[in-house]
Amino acid sequence: MLKNKILTTTLSVSLLAPLANPLLENAKAANDTEDIGKGSDIEIIKRTEDKTSNKWGVTQNIQFDFVKDKKYNKDALILKMQGFISSRTTYYNYKKTNHVKAMRWPFQYNIGLKTNDKYVSLINYLPKNKIESTNVSQTLGYNIGGNFQSAPSLGGNGSFNYSKSISYTQQNYVSEVEQQNSKSVLWGVKANSFATESGQKSAFDSDLFVGYKPHSKDPRDYFVPDSELPPLVQSGFNPSFIATVSHEKGSSDTSEFEITYGRNMDVTHAIKRSTHYGNSYLDGHRVHNAFVNRNYTVKYEVNWKTHEIKVKGQN
């Protein structure tokens, strides 16, 4: 179901307006208008679009914040990419065998933004560097004149006319930028290492998630219980990423952006084997990137004059 929310914000002309309180950001987004200060040098016009695909198990919640700054010679747009990517973790008999069970799980979550418009350039994005912490919190701030800066966390010591924050959890995973240029950015949230009953294991360990019940007929029992799986494997991932783009004023009225959410899937096989003495045990075998780019891509059209957002296509 497509939702469209419109908010208009007028910001103070002061160059040192207080940093927006990120804890109030979501609550404010529910209002029709948001008054931050007097003056009209900067106007923030907001749109929100929601798109869901049951086929891909993905929901995109995209916030489009148009920055109308009289002291900046370009149009600017802040895109905050949120939503949910289901893990799609599944368990099954491998090729109808009785002694090999399979677990398909997300080794990597994909989040990407792309445009082919020659008048549009990517000027900033979050996160930028490889991040290994479980909880990720960063802020992108804007000051009059087209100055975008990032603060390290939600409590960053910055003073901005306007700011936008990201916050997400990635237990046992790491975030890094895989590709970036003037027209696109692609992040990968990748499995890293896991604490197990037998000690710390690499995400590439062939026995990762293999269980201890070789006599069960249920494929699920060949692998560790849900209580030993991190949220990004058991249920899914809630992304929160930001990209900022500029647009040449007086050029094109509209631009198109492709936003992609998805996953790369690994398959772990649990193989029932027997010792020389007849005792059964489970042996792991791993297929890395067995299914890649299982992605949901939505094409959004942005109108720089009317500030309308249209969905032009999806896979």
Swiss-Prot record:
GO terms for molecular function: toxin activity. Residues 1-29 form the signal peptide. Induction: Less protein is secreted in a secG or double secG/secY2 mutant (at protein level). GO terms for biological process: cytolysis in another organism. Transmembrane segments: none annotated. One of its GO terms (cellular component) is extracellular region. Keywords: Cytolysis, Hemolysis, Secreted, Signal, Toxin, Virulence. The keyword Ribosomal protein does not apply. Its main location: secreted. It comes from the Bacteria. It is found in: Secreted. InterPro entries: Bi-component_toxin_staph, Leukocidin/Hemolysin_toxin, Leukocidin/porin_MspA_sf. Toxicity requires sequential binding and synergistic association of a class S and a class F component which form heterooligomeric complexes. HlgB (class F) associates with either hlgA thus forming an AB toxin or with hlgC thus forming a CB toxin. Toxin that seems to act by forming pores in the membrane of the cell. Has a hemolytic and a leucotoxic activity. Belongs to the aerolysin family. This is Gamma-hemolysin component C.
